[in-house]
Regions:
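Glycine-rich, low-complexity intrinsically disordered segments
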Residues: 1-193
Length: 193
């Protein structure tokens, strides 16, 4: 069987590819004493993120001088997102309040005690670049019971000209799910609230 290696064949198969700069992050912030988070602002200020990863452990079972490998438990790595600091520092302030409600700085107390209170959903959406598709969602990952565990420092310096401050929030979460992969034309077809 002949192998085709034409550029035209490659371009037909790859089309435009998926662009890493076409994404959206939606964070379902806790409600209540934290005040009203501007969810839309946080979504716009998210400058970088990643599609979450997972790992399946391996159980090695000795058998007659060899190790037989059996699939183990699934684990989920930390997830982080970087945000541009808005003029009023509202996004940064809200994450700091969220962290403080999980465990306060001064009193070592928690305003949000139950995981269902401080653990929220985060949705990472991979979007379509093709304008004719209207920026449709290609795939969406929903992180369940996510909560921030750290807010990075923001470096300040006199020589930091022509820059906007950024900070990174690291999250822990229980697991992630992805939309329906059986949808037509490669679209996820999911509607995640």
């Amino acid at each position: 069987m002949a192998v085709t290696s034409k550029v035209s064949t490659f371009l037909t198969k790859v089309s435009q590819g998926v662009r890493p700069n076409m994404f959206q992050v939606d964070i379902n912030f806790p409600e209540g004493d934290l005040g009203d988070a501007d969810k839309e602002l946080a979504s716009f200020m998210c400058n970088s993120a990643n599609l979450p990863s997972s790992n399946v452990g391996v159980i090695e079972v000795p058998f007659r001088g060899r190790s037989v490998k059996i699939a183990g438990d699934r684990t989920f790595d930390n997830w982080s997102a970087t945000f541009i600091n808005d003029k009023d520092m509202r996004t940064r302030s809200y994450f700091e309040k969220w962290l403080n409600e999980i465990n306060s700085h001064e009193n070592n107390t928690a305003g949000l005690i139950n995981p269902s209170e401080y653990g929220r959903t985060v949705v990472v959406r991979q979007l379509e670049k093709d304008d004719s598709a209207g920026g449709d969602e290609l795939r969406a990952y929903k992180l369940w019971y996510a909560f921030p565990t750290s807010a990075s420092a923001i470096d300040l310096a006199y020589d930091s000209n022509d820059q906007i401050e950024e900070f990174t929030i690291e999250f822990q979460y229980s697991y992630w799910t992805v939309g329906d992969t059986e949808a037509p034309a490669g679209r996820s077809g999911i509607a995640i609230p």
